[in-house]
C-alpha cells in the first residue's frame, strides 16, 4: 500500500493539544464543476420533500471535553427514504474515495480524527432497515445494514419554540445514551438528524443527557424543483454493525497504531521539537455506547 507522511505540529499543555495538520498526499477536492455525481456512479432512490440543516455540537474527548466542536448536518427527507450525514465527514470520505478511484491510494483522514464520527445514515433503505456508512481510514468505507430499531420515546408536556416552530419534548434511552428531543407537529414528518425517528412530527432538536452530542435545526427548505436522493455506487467494505464498532474502537482508542497498521507513516512534533505519541490524545466517545 502506498505510504504517506503526515506531520502534526502542536502546542502541548497539561489540558489540551492544539494540532495543525498538513498533508503531503494530494487530495481531490470537489468543486462546482466536478461534483460527486460526476465522479461516482449513482442511483436515485427517492426524491426530497424537505431538506433540514442542523448544527451539531459534540465532545470528542472523554478525558476532558472542555472544547466541544461543531459541524453541519443535513437531513434529506424523501417520500420513503431519509438521508442524513455530517458535512465534513461525508466530504472527507468522498475525497478519499475519489483519490482511491483515480490513484489507487486511499490516503488518510487524520485531520478528521476530531470529527463526530456518527456516520452517514439512510433510513428505510432498504425498506425497514438502516444503511450505515462509516469511513475507517486505511480500511476504507464500511457499510452495513440493520433493522430499524424502535426508539422508545416518552412524550412529555414540556413545550418550547425552535426556529419559530412550537415544539414538544420527548425522551428515550437508546444504545447507552439518554436523549431529549424537541419535535413539531406543524411538520408531520417523523424524522430528524442521524437515526432519530418515530415521533409524530419533525425533530427540531436533540441532546444527550450528558451534553456530549447536541443537534439543533438551523434551516428548513422545501425544494422548488425535483431533487433526487442519491445512493453512490462506489466501493464499500460490506460488513456488520459489530465489526464496524470493533474497527471504530481501534481507530479512536489508538489512532497512531491504527494508521500505522495500514502503512500510513507520520510524525507528531511539539513546538519544542519533541516527538509526541499520538496515543496521548483520546478521542473515544462514540455516539453508540452499546
For each feature predicted by the language model, list its residue ranges.
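Extended soluble regions of mature proteins
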Residues: 33-290
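Bacterial Sec-dependent N-terminal signal peptides
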Residues: 1-41
Amino acid at each position: 500500500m502506498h505510504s504517506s507522511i503526515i506531520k502534526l505540529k502542536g502546542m502541548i499543555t497539561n489540558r489540551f493539544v492544539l494540532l495543525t495538520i498538513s498533508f503531503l498526499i494530494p487530495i481531490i477536492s470537489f468543486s462546482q464543476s466536478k461534483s460527486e455525481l460526476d465522479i461516482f456512479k449513482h442511483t436515485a432512490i427517492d426524491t426530497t420533500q424537505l431538506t433540514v440543516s442542523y448544527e451539531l455540537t459534540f465532545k470528542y474527548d472523554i478525558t476532558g471535553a472542555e472544547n466541544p466542536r461543531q459541524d453541519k448536518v443535513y437531513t434529506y427527507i424523501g417520500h420513503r427514504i431519509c438521508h442524513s450525514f455530517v458535512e465534513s465527514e461525508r466530504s472527507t470520505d468522498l475525497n478519499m474515495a475519489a483519490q482511491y478511484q483515480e490513484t489507487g491510494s486511499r490516503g488518510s483522514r487524520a485531520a478528521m480524527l476530531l470529527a463526530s464520527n456518527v456516520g452517514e445514515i439512510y433510513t428505510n433503505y432498504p425498506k425497514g432497515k438502516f444503511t450505515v456508512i462509516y469511513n475507517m481510514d486505511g480500511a476504507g468505507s464500511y457499510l452495513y445494514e440493520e433493522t430499524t430499531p424502535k426508539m422508545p420515546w416518552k412524550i412529555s408536556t414540556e413545550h418550547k419554540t425552535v426556529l419559530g416552530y412550537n415544539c414538544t419534548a420527548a425522551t428515550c434511552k437508546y444504545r447507552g445514551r439518554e436523549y431529549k428531543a424537541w419535535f413539531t407537529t406543524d411538520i408531520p414528518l417523523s424524522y430528524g438528524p442521524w437515526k432519530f425517528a418515530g415521533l409524530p412530527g419533525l425533530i427540531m432538536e436533540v441532546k444527550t443527557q450528558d451534553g456530549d452530542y447536541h443537534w439543533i435545526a438551523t434551516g428548513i427548505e422545501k425544494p422548488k424543483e425535483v431533487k433526487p436522493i442519491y445512493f453512490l455506487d462506489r466501493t464499500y467494505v460490506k460488513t456488520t454493525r459489530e465489526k464496524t464498532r470493533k474497527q471504530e474502537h481501534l481507530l479512536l482508542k489508538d489512532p497512531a497504531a491504527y494508521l500505522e497498521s495500514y502503512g500510513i507513516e507520520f510524525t507528531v512534533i511539539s513546538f519544542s521539537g519533541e516527538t509526541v505519541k499520538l496515543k496521548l490524545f483520546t478521542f473515544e466517545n462514540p455516539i453508540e455506547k452499546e
